[in-house]
């Protein structure tokens, strides 16, 4: 279910402050965050944000095509290693 257009997109305050500070200094630096629920807004374009996936922080470069999506969409949390092999030889 999408967020109402009457409301603004959710962006964590600490993340917004860090991005605004880097934009005023015109610096590029990796921003570490745990806020997977934050929406990507246009002022984030061009920054690299390290998003937590539950184990480590994955650095993601933000492009203009990502605007409107959530940060968590780009850092998968599950690591599928395939289905278990059938072990018929050990049963014999």
Curated annotation (Swiss-Prot):
User: GO molecular function terms here?
Assistant: rRNA binding; structural constituent of ribosome
* Pfam families in UniProt: Ribosomal_S19
What compartments host this protein? Answer: Plastid, Chloroplast
Q: Could you tell me which InterPro entries the record lists for this protein?
A: Ribosomal_uS19, Ribosomal_uS19_bac-type, Ribosomal_uS19_CS, Ribosomal_uS19_SF
The processes (GO biological process) annotated in the record are: translation
Q: Which SUPFAM superfamilies match?
A: Ribosomal protein S19
Keyword RNA-binding among UniProt keywords:
yes
Return the GO cellular component terms, semicolon-separated: chloroplast; small ribosomal subunit
| UniProt keyword terms in alphabetical order | Chloroplast, Plastid, Ribonucleoprotein, Ribosomal protein, RNA-binding, rRNA-binding
Q: NCBIfam families recorded for this chain?
A: rpsS_bact (TIGR01050)
Q: Which family does it belong to?
A: Belongs to the universal ribosomal protein uS19 family.
Read off the PANTHER family from this record: RIBOSOMAL PROTEIN S19P FAMILY MEMBER, SMALL RIBOSOMAL SUBUNIT PROTEIN US19M
Query: Its function?
Result: Protein S19 forms a complex with S13 that binds strongly to the 16S ribosomal RNA.
- What name does the UniProt record give this protein? Small ribosomal subunit protein uS19c
Q: Which organism is it from?
A: Helianthus annuus (Common sunflower)
């Amino acid at each position: 279910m999408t967020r109402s257009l009457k409301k603004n997109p959710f962006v964590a305050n600490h993340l917004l402050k860090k991005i605004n500070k880097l934009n005023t200094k015109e610096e590029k630096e990796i921003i570490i965050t745990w806020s997977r629920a934050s929406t990507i807004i246009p002022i984030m374009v061009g920054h690299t944000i390290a998003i937590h996936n539950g184990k480590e922080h994955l650095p993601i470069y933000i492009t203009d095509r990502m605007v409107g999506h959530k940060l968590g969409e780009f850092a998968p949390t599950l690591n599928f290693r395939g289905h278990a092999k059938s072990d018929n030889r050990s049963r014999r």
